Amino acid sequence: MVFSSTIFLFGFLPLSLLIYYVMPMRIRNLALFLLSLVFYGFGEPTYVAVMLFSVTVAYLTGFPIGKYRESNPKKAKFWLILSVCLNLGMLLFFKYTNFFIENLALIPPLSGVLEPMEGLTLPIGISFYTFQIMSYSIDLYRGSTDTQKSFVSFGAYVALFPQLIAGPIVRYRDVDDQLMTRTHSVDKFSSGVSRFTVGFAKKILLGDSLAAVYAYLGTVYAVEPTTLTAWLMVLTYTLHIYFDFSGYSDMAIGLGRMIGFEFLENFNYPYLASSITDFWRRWHISLSSWFREYVYIPLGGNRKGLPRQFFNMGVVWLLTGFWHGASWNFVLWGVFYFVILALEKAFLLKWFEKNTATRALGHIWALILVGMGWMIFDHTTLSEAFAVIGGMFGLGTVGFASPTVGYELSRTLPLLAVSVIAATPFPARIMAKLESSRPRLAVLRPVLIGVALLLAMAYMVSGTFSPFLYFIF
């Protein structure tokens, strides 16, 4: 079940909110846990058991970790390693088994001997909830949080349906207090509804519309590759993935507020970044901070000299690529960013920060490289990715433009213009300025949100099913 579906919007969501609010406070976590299991099991009930196994392992090992972390650190570390290995092992098995089998089978002695496991599919959201579970075990070992004694409350944390499928990755210590006591108010609920609606509109009205344009441009480029088509493909996908993923995050944060939770932000206008380093402070913030805290810093971070720092960065970005998927294009995507970030760390960042002109160049640098990176990210066949990237610079094309792509550009220019503006903070700033200067215009916000909701619902009902991109990770 996904947020942008009729069964969720008109069935599961209102029913869940009704059940949640009629329940006494003391059993609301139980209600959330059971509702989240129903939400998760709607699409693939067999994998509910996989998630419950991971929850049970982390919950049970949490007791000895918390008990021995001070009196017997070695024993606590044993239980930590057991928890991490079992949970990470589940992720590795389901996500990467067939990838490694298929690649090992390319070696002549193993060709025909190794066969992919039939019927092995990836449990939805396993990459996200595994990282959440690991954050609990690691933080508990470090003494950053306390042992959760309630299986129901811990299960509710892991399975919480607003962020179960595609994040944000919520660290346990960021919500441990909220699991016990959280505030509910009309203002908080209405804020959640507004945030959910904004995300829903971003996903349906902009993200899905851009996805359709991108798919069409891909077919055009395969037949008649031109430089303009390549650039339009990069632009539409760059905007599409932002509105799709940030839209989901907005919806998750909004849903969380409706039931009293406050999740950390996952995006901060990433396409305004002044460098690739800055971009990764703004894009998928929960994933970047997770790798920084649980991989990069434990490896030594930037404390052991530049060569070791580059090694640590390489490990992080190799894992980041693999986390996104069991395919070589994701590995290359991670390596691509490692190389760029290493160059920035070595000397480019200082140059970008020299003056206004170099900062502007840094912004252009970031936008072009991010767009190129998205082509690697989207194409599992690397030759197709390289063809589009080469086409951006006139390599392998039949010219700069064609009548077909010229017509498509004129047809989609309003969508592209609205999308570019919506990817910046300007709409929010203009609205805030209007509300502060003319208080009567405060009514404009709910009206616009209501219109956006109706338009998005109409588009969703009349359109085809389009799951979130990060749904598959």
Residue ranges and their predicted role:
Residues 1-472:
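Membrane-embedded transmembrane alpha-helical bundles that form the catalytic cores
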